[in-house]
């Protein structure tokens, strides 16, 4: 059995996690838990992995916290109140209405219709 070493750890959007799980399942390392997790992520996915990664990257100019960017790219809120409910996680910063609108505009570019 090979050893696994964690080199880095990052927060990732749901759709990126789904893609990684898909790769593991395709390699033959599937289990009931992995399949159920994949099915759940498939049911809540609002944009593909590539688009979610672009959302995270574009949000970095507005939001410094990686975890907040990952949650936004996972949930894809499209109203100011939804965005604010997530931004509350970042208690060290106050976001303006303009910031919130920029976040919504970025998300809308990539969300599935």
Swiss-Prot record:
- The answer to keyword Cell cycle applying to this record is no
**Its function?**
DNA-dependent RNA polymerase (RNAP) catalyzes the transcription of DNA into RNA using the four ribonucleoside triphosphates as substrates. The highly mobile Rpo4/Rpo7 heterodimer stalk is conditionally required for transcription initiation.
Its source organism is Saccharolobus shibatae (strain ATCC 51178 / DSM 5389 / JCM 8931 / NBRC 15437 / B12) (Sulfolobus shibatae)
An example GO biological process term is: DNA-templated transcription initiation
| This enzyme's EC code(s) | 2.7.7.6
Please tell me one Gene Ontology term that the record gives under cellular component: cytoplasm
Q: What is its main location?
A: cytoplasm
What are the entry keywords?
Cytoplasm, DNA-directed RNA polymerase, Nucleotidyltransferase, Transcription, Transferase
> What is the enzyme's main class?
transferase
Q: How does it assemble?
A: Part of the 13-subunit RNA polymerase complex. Forms a stalk with Rpo7 that extends from the main structure.
Which NCBIfam families does this chain map to?
A: PRK14981.1-5
Q: Where in the cell is it found?
A: Cytoplasm
User: InterPro entries given for it?
Assistant: HRDC-like_sf, HRDC_dom_sf, Rpb4/RPC9, Rpo4
Name recorded for this polypeptide = DNA-directed RNA polymerase subunit Rpo4
Q: Highest taxon of the source?
A: Archaea
The answer, when asked if Transcription is one of the entry's keywords, is yes
The GO terms this record gives for MF are: DNA-directed RNA polymerase activity; nucleotide binding
Write out the similarity annotation. Belongs to the eukaryotic RPB4 RNA polymerase subunit family.
| Reaction equation(s) it catalyzes | RNA(n) + a ribonucleoside 5'-triphosphate = RNA(n+1) + diphosphate
């Amino acid at each position: 059995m090979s050893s696994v070493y964690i080199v880095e750890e990052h927060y990732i959007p749901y759709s990126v996690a789904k893609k990684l799980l898909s790769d593991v399942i395709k390699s033959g390392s599937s289990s009931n838990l992995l399949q159920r997790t994949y099915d759940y992520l498939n049911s809540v996915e609002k944009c593909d992995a590539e688009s979610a990664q672009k959302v995270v990257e574009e949000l970095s100019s507005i939001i410094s916290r990686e975890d907040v960017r990952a949650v936004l790219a996972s949930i894809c809120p499209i109203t100011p109140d939804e965005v604010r409910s997530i931004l509350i996680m970042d208690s060290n910063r106050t976001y303006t209405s303009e910031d919130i609108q920029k976040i919504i505009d970025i998300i809308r570019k990539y969300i599935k219709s």
